[in-house]
Amino acid sequence: YWFLKDKTLGQVMVGHIPQASQHAAVLVDGSGTMVAANWTPINSLAVGLTRNGVELTAPNPGLGLPVVGFPVGAAMWCGSTSLPTGGNCEPISIDGVRYDSPTFAGFSASASWGADDFWDVALRYAGEISGFKFAAVAAYYHNSDERAYTGFNTVVGTSNPLKRDAGYFQAGAYLQHVKSGLFLYGAYGKEYNDNILDDGNAFKLGIPGNLTAEQPDGHVWYIKAGIRQNWLPLGATVLYGEYEERNDMFHPDMIALGVDGSQNKQWGLGLVQEIDAAAMSLWLTYRNYETSFSGPGVAGAFDNLDDIDVVTAGAMISF
């Protein structure tokens, strides 16, 4: 992309841009744990749902098709972008135009637009008050482009949208007591879905388009608390705990299987160690996922799902 920037008038970007709401709630997290732990489920497809130790699969209609497994991302679905990334529902840059205002007393605003159509707006604040760091954002995104974000559906064999009309609101805030290093971060997201999917693709079982129009408006909330202190000469050490709930953010193809509601609960603990001399962060994290579905087709098929435990070690060098 290319851009024009002026200290007084702000900045305009044109091309393959990060939209105004992209990662909005994630990026206000100033704890140093933003990459190691946020509300984006980076392993949503790598981890499969199981019941009594057996992988959960869709019914096989006897057409010689491969068996379809259910990753935990089936309960983390973003209707506005057809991606298993709830609540970070706008993670991918797209072609468009974006404007960012100058900062006034800690406040700034952004807006972006792209053809066929998407648009979004965001309002941000960052500052320090009475020994506390504080940052917050609120953003809204609307997408009515059926052609956008269809590659994922095609690859995994789920239904593409015939009509996309979906919005997503998100808000996030971060508060840290500077002297003690104690911090609190929270985020909330709400979907507004009015999509209609291809009525013949859902697990090859067939799903009427009028049913997919009944996909609920899911919501998600996330909270993280901890302490950030320079206990070692290497750099800051961060200890944290997190909790998240995603409600009714299931993939709409599951309506064909009698699902009309879902809940995904997540909690975790983690340690991040910064190494200032190398611009590096090291982390070790643990997460537990508890997933459930509800509806007339759930009993005996999707009930009593096993919890999922995930341990992750990682490193990042910033340059």
Locate predicted features.
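Active-site-proximal beta-strand/loop segments in catalytic clefts of secreted hydrolases
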Residues: 15-18, 113-115, 139-141, 187-189, ...
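Outer membrane beta-barrel
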Residues: 1-120, 124-130, 135
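Extracellular/periplasm-exposed beta-strand and loop segments of Gram-negative cell-envelope proteins
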Residues: 31-71, 75-88, 149-151, 158-168, ...
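Membrane-spanning beta-strand positions in outer-membrane beta-barrel proteins
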Residues: 11-13, 108, 135, 181-183, ...
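Detector for outer-membrane/organellar transmembrane beta-barrel domains
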Residues: 122-274
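C-terminal closing repeat unit and adjoining cap/tail of repeat-based domains
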Residues: 270-291
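Membrane-spanning beta-strands of outer-membrane beta-barrel proteins
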Residues: 92, 104, 116-118, 165-168, ...
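Outer-membrane beta-barrel "beta-signal"
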Residues: 307-319
